A protein has these predicted regions:
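Extracellular/periplasmic carbohydrate-active domains that bind, remodel
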Residues: 1-461
Length: 461
């Protein structure tokens, strides 16, 4: 078991893992939970275990009658997101839950952050008629790196486990669908990151990722880079090592992310525009991105919904709405925010909309908007941040977090964050009327509005 206070290991330049470290011979080799067991509609489901979480993928086309047995004593039980209104009936060690439609939620006992159960419900996805690569139920496939080509449709059947990574480069019309699992543990050491993306599509057009579970990858988990027309739907994305970002939308356009569950040990949903593996072709504008109806757990480190740090081209017309951030854990470094924009480069960031977002726990910061110079910087001239809109952001539990807005100043350059709008921000049901209510700290920022009233205009020196 990890010591999460002292042994969260980050190697900025990890030794390369040049080939898979192990071969899975059977689905039975994946560790199973001893704390939880789950049945749905009378059928027992497999509950997997990691040192950071347990999880069960529940696939059915009917209503869900769940029986979750918890085999260790506990005093307090929490089901998140609370917005789902799930009311459990507890009898003995068994928690009974009925769902009329598939939901993705957590079962947490006594506030434990590393032994929760993720219950990940989905409708069954049938095998598409145009399937070109099929992974069948009950089997393990050691693919190393699965390289796709144009018009590939990958089907991962419920109960199949694919061990390895998936890459696509300059492909059109590719899909990965199904209710099975892709496991990336073979590409990194047990307690460290590796210099390799998990599911990586570069310069692809018309990409669909739907239904499957991506768990324990070597670094960033789902990375559409310089892609157009991407849909990420109903995925379960879970990491347990540092730099284990959930989804990194990098230099891509016309992207939709919906109905996903993301638990990440770094940024959960992240927007970037930067060189990847020294490739300058992956620097491009990011626009027309919609992220909605997702459940997000940001474990240490990183941020839950992040723009940055590498924003080297224009970032505009993005919408984040109707999401539940159930945890944003304390980082103690530059990140640790539920919603953040970190501009370390020269791209202009504007017209970004956040609406109807519920935050159940933000241990460090709620909003964090900065222009800065840091170790991720590649462009010294800094881009502006302006016309940022927050509407109906609710903090539901926990301590009231601080928020920060800060521009950038040197003897030769000044870049101020401006025109940031906060409307209907509430802490435990209490509406914030002023920046003081929000615990908002500003520096080198102009024209900050709270409920339509300009509250901050700082003098230039």
């Amino acid at each position: 078991m990890k010591d999460f206070e002292n042994d969260l290991i980050y190697y900025p330049n990890p030794d390369p893992v040049k080939e898979p470290r192990f071969i899975l011979k059977s689905v039975d080799e994946l560790e199973k939970s001893t704390k939880y067991s789950v049945t749905c509609n009378g059928t027992e489901r497999v509950v997997y275990h990691t040192d950071s979480f347990d999880y069960v993928v529940v696939v059915d086309n009917e209503a869900y009658d769940l029986e979750i047995s918890i085999h260790t004593p506990y005093e307090k039980l929490e089901i998140r997101p609370s917005s789902f209104g799930i009311v459990p009936f507890v009898k003995g060690e068994t928690v009974h839950i009925h769902l009329d439609e598939p939901r993705k939620f957590t079962v947490e006992t006594d506030g434990g952050l590393h032994d929760a159960l993720f219950v990940l419900c989905s409708h069954r996805i049938e095998k598409p008629a145009d399937t070109t690569i099929c992974f069948e139920k009950g089997k393990v496939y050691n693919v190393g790196v699965l390289t796709l080509k144009s018009n590939d449709t990958v089907y991962i059947e419920e109960g199949a486990v694919v061990s390895g990574c998936v890459y696509a480069d300059h492909c059109d019309n590719i899909s990965i669908v199904g209710n099975g699992i892709i496991n990336g543990a073979c590409w990194h050491l047990p307690d460290s990151n590796a210099h390799r993306f998990f599911i990586y599509a570069k310069w692809c057009n018309n990409v669909l990722l739907k239904g499957f579970t991506a768990v324990d990858g070597p670094s960033w988990h789902v990375v559409p880079a310089a892609c157009d027309h991407v849909v990420i739907d109903d995925m379960n994305i879970m990491s347990r090592i540092v730099t284990g970002d959930g989804i990194d939308i990098t230099s891509s356009q016309d992207v939709e992310v919906k109905n996903c569950f993301i638990r990440s040990t770094d940024d959960s949903i992240c927007i970037k525009s930067q060189r990847l593996f020294e490739d300058p072709s992956t620097v491009r504008d990011v626009t027309k991105v919609r992220v909605h109806n997702n459940v997000i757990w940001n474990a240490e480190p990183g941020n839950a919904i992040e723009l940055g740090y590498a924003l080297q081209s224009e970032i505009h017309d993005l919408v984040f709405e109707d999401c539940d951030i159930i945890h944003c854990q304390y980082e103690g470094n530059m990140g640790g925010a539920a919603i953040s924009i970190h501009q370390a480069d020269g791209g202009h960031v504007h017209d970004i909309h956040y609406k109807n977002i519920r935050v159940e726990q933000a241990q460090q910061k709620l909003f964090d908007i900065k222009v800065l110079l840091c170790r991720y910087t590649e462009q010294l001239a800094k881009g502006e941040i302006n016309d940022i809109y927050f509407d109906n952001i609710q903090v539901l539990n926990g301590d009231i977090p601080v928020s920060m807005i800060r521009g950038y100043q040197t003897p030769t350059e000044e870049v101020r964050v401006h025109d940031v709008h906060f409307d209907n921000i509430t802490f435990m049901g209490n509406k914030c009327e002023t920046w003081q209510d929000m615990r908002l700290v500003t520096e080198l920022a102009n024209d900050i509005y709270v409920n339509g009233v300009r509250t901050c205009r700082q003098m230039k020196f």
